[in-house]
């Protein structure tokens, strides 16, 4: 049975992807047999609202047995908030977060609860990916996540920008394939 990977895109991304190379469509191919990637369009990506995205994520996760979650940018931050605030957190195989903004008090709709690290302490694995040359989400945001989620695996990259515009994302594919190895041990 194929493992389901749910990829939650960032705000405004479907419009921006039209002319760029992007890793997401090739993720399933790079993972090989045994994986099925779903990348649903989220509601109003040009003007996102947390609750509309959270409801959509709830439906997607609820219809999938122990999914692997991958979020990019705004999508990654919504996944974190959803998982931190969900009373009955669904069973997940792993959480992979790319270029994730750390929303502060200026953005209360998107800000995480102050104790979100403790709330997510039993969620494993969590992998964080961030490029030092990201011009949209400062590298310091990843450092903040690293401090609050000390059990997370952190992958620091140097030349991927914010969009991670490339045909392949070998680090992500390797980490996802590593889940199967962890289960086999």
Regions found by a protein language model. Name each.
Residues 36, 146-163:
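Catalytic histidine neighborhood in serine/cysteine hydrolases
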